[in-house]
């Protein structure tokens, strides 16, 4: 009964309303943290999962061994791989496509890869005017990997103790 009376007076005096207004007032005069995005950029974590890339070994050979683990583990079914056997008995990919309109950027493909062939870079600014522009082929993924290899290697090194 006493609790009901206390609740009645609190609601009658609009205590919750004033607590909310006090909180709003506190943030109204606090320092603003808005970032003007195209001109200013916030730091990106080494674990950020952005645009995909295929990597090469230092001798120039592509890392992907066509094990298809990334294709199997992808929950969105965004990866398509085709492969052929080479003369020395190893397999290499003939087709490696990622449909970024399906991809959910979960990072499972990167975790499943035994040779670190597929990685997600820190690139977050990419777009397409048509739906097909977000369909990345093997050559496009290798070009991204070649262009950003120093950043990819630095991010891998920064994250090495957590892997």
Curated annotation (Swiss-Prot):
Keyword Phosphoprotein attributed: no
Cofactor(s) named in the record: [4Fe-4S] cluster
Residues where [4Fe-4S] cluster 2 binds: 74, 103, 106, 109
Bilayer topology term: Peripheral membrane protein
Location(s), subcellular: Cell inner membrane
Uppermost EC category: translocase
Annotated residues for binding of [4Fe-4S] cluster 1: 64, 67, 70, 113
Catalytic activity, as annotated: a quinone + NADH + 5 H(+)(in) = a quinol + NAD(+) + 4 H(+)(out)
One BP term from GO: aerobic respiration
Keyword entries, A-Z: 4Fe-4S, Cell inner membrane, Cell membrane, Iron, Iron-sulfur, Membrane, Metal-binding, NAD, Quinone, Repeat, Translocase, Ubiquinone
Record field: transmembrane: none
Textual note on the cofactor: Binds 2 [4Fe-4S] clusters per subunit.
InterPro entries: 4Fe4S_Fe-S-bd, 4Fe4S_Fe_S_CS, NADH_quinone_OxRdtase_chainI
Any Gene Ontology CC annotation: plasma membrane
Residue ranges of domain 4Fe-4S ferredoxin-type in the record: 54-84, 94-123
EC number(s) recorded for this UniProt protein: 7.1.1.-
Oligomeric form and interacting partners: NDH-1 is composed of 14 different subunits. Subunits NuoA, H, J, K, L, M, N constitute the membrane sector of the complex.
Function, in words: NDH-1 shuttles electrons from NADH, via FMN and iron-sulfur (Fe-S) centers, to quinones in the respiratory chain. The immediate electron acceptor for the enzyme in this species is believed to be ubiquinone. Couples the redox reaction to proton translocation (for every two electrons transferred, four hydrogen ions are translocated across the cytoplasmic membrane), and thus conserves the redox energy in a proton gradient.
Family the UniProt entry places it in: Belongs to the complex I 23 kDa subunit family.
Designated name of the protein: NADH-quinone oxidoreductase subunit I
Source organism phylogeny: Bacteria, Pseudomonadati, Pseudomonadota, Betaproteobacteria, Burkholderiales
